[in-house]
Each structure stands twice: as structure tokens, then as C-alpha cells.
Design a protein with these regions (language model features):
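Accessory interaction regions appended to the cores of large information-processing enzymes
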Residues: 1-210
């Protein structure tokens, strides 16, 4: 999406508002997944709502990126941990001084967009720099996570995530909505669904009658 972290996004957004008097609506970036259906038809899908259901007969591929990180060697350990969490594959390591190491990594674009740069800055105390370029398309191990409020699907909350993060993200989104949605006159159930089942669920208690 062109921004190196949330701070960069906020700075550019504020400048556009102040200097050009623009009213901006900021939305999450989307990724084009390549879906090949059982009948041989191939299409690129951006909207999570159009993503295949769990168990559907379809082959899914996603874009990967080639990432280059320059950082002090002292932060290699924390960076390796971060890369593992973001499905990064280190393909080359080069040390060109006592103070700088270059890592070349391949990783899914969706993981780069999952706040990777901000987390990298935190892991390296701000010393790391990052650049990336598009690489290729690869088979994707992903699922669609849906959110239901009071038994109704809310398409705006649907997202495509790595299968290994399904349970964690399901719990996080349910807890977040539970903390911000207002109470009603009736009990409101919040559910996160993926892998063909309800992964996480919480209920907002009803308002007490006077």
C-alpha cells in the first residue's frame, strides 16, 4: 500500500488533510488472491466475502514479496523471531561491517501488510530499514474468518488470514467487538467463524430494565 507502518500513514494522511483540505476515508488494503475453481476457471478475488468457503474445491494462490532488511547484528535474534511469526523465509544473509547485516527474505504479502514494519522497528529499537519488491505467486494456506453479531453475518468484518492464526485472531476480534459494541435491550452474541465452525464466542449482557 506504499506506507512504511502506521506512523507513516498517519503523517501522510494528516498532510493531505491540512495542505489539500481533503476528507479522507482510510480502509485496510486488500490482496488479490488467485482462485482456481474445480471447473478450471481462474479469477482474482479481492473481497473476503467472495473467498471460497472452508472445504470448497478450489486452489488458492497468493502473492509473495522479496524483502531486504538492513539491521545491526545485535538484533538478529529478535528479528528472526518476528520473521517466524510472519512466515518469512530467509534466503540470504550478508554481513558487510561489524555494525550492519543484510537479510533477504521471502514472505507472503499479507504478512508484510500485517503491521510488519512497525513490529520490525520495535524489535530493532528503530535501527532496521526495509525495502521490498513483488516476487511470485504461491499456494496459500489461508482461511476466511467471518464475524456474526446477533446471529447475522457482518461482511465488513470478514478477513482472509493465515490458517495458523485463525484461533488467535478469532479471539482478538471477538474481544475487541465485545469491548466496543453498546449494550442493547437483549443479549447480543458475538461469534467468529472459520474452518467450518464457531471458533470464538462472547455475549454482551442486556440492559437492565428500570
Amino acid at each position: 500500500c506504499g506506507f512504511l507502518g502506521m506512523l507513516h500513514l498517519e503523517i501522510i494522511t494528516e498532510r493531505l488533510k491540512r495542505e489539500f483540505n481533503l476528507n479522507l476515508i482510510i480502509t485496510a488494503p486488500s490482496i488479490a488472491y488467485e482462485i482456481t475453481w474445480h471447473n478450471g476457471k481462474t479469477e482474482h478475488i479481492y473481497a473476503p466475502s467472495r473467498f471460497p468457503d472452508h472445504g470448497a474445491s478450489a486452489t488458492i494462490r497468493e502473492p509473495w514479496v522479496r524483502v531486504q532488511i538492513i539491521l545491526p547484528p545485535d538484533y538478529l535474534g529478535s528479528t528472526m523471531t518476528l520473521l517466524h511469526d510472519h512466515e518469512g523465509e530467509i534466503i540470504d544473509t550478508e554481513t558487510f561491517s561489524d555494525e550492519r547485516t543484510i537479510l533477504t527474505i521471502l514472505m507472503p504479502l499479507r504478512e508484510l501488510m500485517r503491521n510488519f514494519f512497525d513490529q520490525l522497528k520495535n524489535a530493532t529499537s528503530g535501527y532496521a530499514s526495509l525495502s521490498y519488491e513483488m516476487s511470485d505467486m504461491r499456494p496459500a494456506d489461508v482461511e476466511r474468518l467471518d464475524v456474526l453479531v446477533a446471529g447475522e453475518l457482518v461482511p465488513a468484518f470478514s478477513r482472509v488470514i493465515g490458517t495458523r492464526r485463525v484461533e488467535l485472531e478469532a479471539q482478538q476480534v471477538v474481544e475487541k467487538l465485545h469491548s466496543i459494541l453498546p449494550r442493547q435491550m437483549f443479549v447480543t452474541k458475538i461469534q467468529a467463524s472459520a474452518l467450518g465452525r464457531i471458533i470464538s464466542s462472547r455475549s454482551i449482557s442486556a440492559l437492565k430494565k428500570d
